[in-house]
Amino acid sequence: MTHQTHAYHMVNPSPWPLTGALSALLMTSGLIMWFHFNSTTLLMLGLTTNMLTMYQWWRDVIRESTFQGHHTPNVQKGLRYGMILFIISEVLFFTGFFWAFYHSSLAPTPELGGCWPPTGINPLNPLEVPLLNTSVLLASGVSITWAHHSLMEGNRNHMLQALFITIALGVYFTLLQASEYYEAPFTISDGVYGSTFFVATGFHGLHVIIGSTFLIVCFFRQLKFHFTSNHHFGFEAAAWYWHFVDVVWLFLYVSIYWWGS
């Protein structure tokens, strides 16, 4: 972006939306190729181009905001509205999965044996790994709030410590979820119980990985002194997203693990 004399969010033409769309096409096509023909070539190509696009797009945004000063108060306000709308769209996305779950579980059909969980399904014990996962995510919610308050108070060391703890808890959650999937006595193909369980918890797990990536980027940016107490929207957006992931898990735990078992 060349020199600008206004306070609004008008960026230069960028190739990244196009390469991002093409990488998404490659990933979805690659997923189909993997499922039907057991070939991962297209999927790997899609993932690689997607990672490259994300890296270069975020690099441009960081340059515009941190080094060129284009993220004026007006621009930050617009970005906040954008992030709020994005989180609302994610809430609606998960509402669809909860709707599918309750539609199937509140009035089980004769094919399911007229009961929930369906006949033949051994559900996971909600007081074992799922409860540990809940406490891990709740603890990460506390540590991200600690990081946010430390940043606003200008305490860089505490902010980095709290952010590192949050990332570690996010990675721990992902490992626990992976071990739970590995040991689960049912699969995604075990009727409506398996499909609603794995799709809802799997998409949540994907969001935890995305949120952890977001926080890792913030961690490295803070190591380079990118955030100040009054200019840190990148971190704020990551914190909002992490709280959203936290709340969704509480609903998943109460609905699918505890009530649904």
From Swiss-Prot:
The keyword Translocase applies. One of its GO terms (biological process) is mitochondrial electron transport, cytochrome c to oxygen. Keywords: Membrane, Mitochondrion, Mitochondrion inner membrane, Translocase, Transmembrane, Transmembrane helix. It catalyses: 4 Fe(II)-[cytochrome c] + O2 + 8 H(+)(in) = 4 Fe(III)-[cytochrome c] + 2 H2O + 4 H(+)(out). The chain crosses the membrane at residues 16-34, 41-66, 73-105, 129-152, 156-183, 191-223, 233-256. The keyword Nucleotide-binding does not apply. It holds the Pfam family COX3. One of its GO terms (cellular component) is mitochondrial inner membrane. It is found in: Mitochondrion inner membrane. Component of the cytochrome c oxidase (complex IV, CIV), a multisubunit enzyme composed of 14 subunits. The complex is composed of a catalytic core of 3 subunits MT-CO1, MT-CO2 and MT-CO3, encoded in the mitochondrial DNA, and 11 supernumerary subunits COX4I, COX5A, COX5B, COX6A, COX6B, COX6C, COX7A, COX7B, COX7C, COX8 and NDUFA4, which are encoded in the nuclear genome. Belongs to the cytochrome c oxidase subunit 3 family. This is Cytochrome c oxidase subunit 3. It comes from Gazella subgutturosa (Goitred gazelle). The gene is MT-CO3.
